[in-house]
Regions:
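Soluble ligand-binding/transfer domains with enclosed cavities or grooves
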Residues: 1-182
Length: 182
């Protein structure tokens, strides 16, 4: 089994290894997640591997348990962030993981952008333990979180209809000058 340090360094793991590490990490309460978080993907042979990076994904914003922006993206000039409504994105589709998808994302920004929070946080049991979980309002998706340290969590996205989880890391973003355009 890979260690969490190996996974963080390589940004790569099998779903089995990532879940074994997740099971060893401390579960987190909802209030631990409040704030803005910058994310990156852990390549695990999931159909979504590379997609968020190719589209300019930044991370997530947890304002409070009832108001969560699950998909924050960079603007073209990388100086601002905007929130995307996940309802519009077909999560089960296989997208090309190239610069083309990033261009398409920027062109579609006026249609995808939202000022509304589109998820919430709850304590939910996952893998026989209860942890803070982001519940999308209009998608059958749950993102479960486990604490790596005070400023990092591992996220496991459970997408209904997809057998393997999508793995990502969130790092607390307290010092960024990025403006939120929503």
């Amino acid at each position: 089994m890979k260690s969490i340090e190996d996974i963080l360094k390589d940004r790569k793991a099998t779903a089995k290894d990532a879940l074994e590490i997740f099971d060893l990490l401390e579960m987190v309460p909802v209030d631990f997640m409040i704030g803005r978080w910058k994310g990156f993907e852990i390549e695990s042979n999931h159909q979504m591997d590379g997609l968020l990076a190719a589209t300019g994904w930044y991370g997530k914003l947890f304002l409070n348990p009832e108001e969560v922006h699950p998909l924050l993206f960079y603007t073209k000039n990388l100086t601002e962030l905007y929130s995307v409504n996940p309802r519009i994105i077909p999560m089960h589709m296989r997208f090309p993981k190239s610069g083309v998808v990033g261009i398409l994302m920027r062109l579609a920004k006026p249609f995808l952008q939202t000022k509304k929070a589109t998820a919430r946080l709850r304590m939910i049991e996952y893998r026989n333990r209860v942890t803070a979980t982001m519940c999308y309002d209009e998608k059958a998706i749950l993102d479960h979180f486990a604490k790596i340290d005070e400023n990092r969590v591992m996220g496991v996205m459970d997408l209904k209809g997809v057998s393997e989880p999508y793995i990502f890391i969130l790092e607390r973003d307290g010092d960024s000058d990025l403006k939120q355009n929503f």
